[in-house]
Amino acid sequence: FQSYALLPHYNVFDNVAYGLKIRKVPKDEIREKVLNILKLVEMEGMESRMTNQLSGGQQQRVALARALVLEPGVLLFDEPLSNLDAKLRVTMRTEIRKIQQKVGITAIYVTHDQSEAMSISDKIIIMSKGKVEQIGTPREIYYHPNSRFVADFIGEANFLDAQVLEAGEEKAK
């Protein structure tokens, strides 16, 4: 949600309901679904507020609610926190993760922020120049990077030139 793409002339309720109305879902079902999803994203009671009266974090929640209310099979997040300040980024990534797990939806989360990727993901794909460098859990990638690029990208790393004299199963001299 680099751009939240909210409809500025619609209130929160109508922004979230928009996709359901396009699909011609009955009004009573729309109301129930929208109110339930707004509760999930902690925006209940704000249905009548205009989107330009909301903070960045609240706008993000409305955009997330609008996507979730349609019950997609997969949700794509493209740099969703890039427009938020550092403190709100931490709060929102925790919220996104919590909501994603509660709903049980598969999410693809694109980010250049390593700490964000490590904290929100079950599985990470690290890419460089359009090529997959490594796929694994955050723990696997952090503790067992398979290339210098991955090690440098994920953590604070020191690289030392060395010569292996003897190789064992777990250690080298």
Segments predicted by a language model, with ranges:
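ABC ATPase nucleotide-binding domains
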Residues: S3-D152
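ATPase nucleotide-binding modules
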Residues: N146-K173
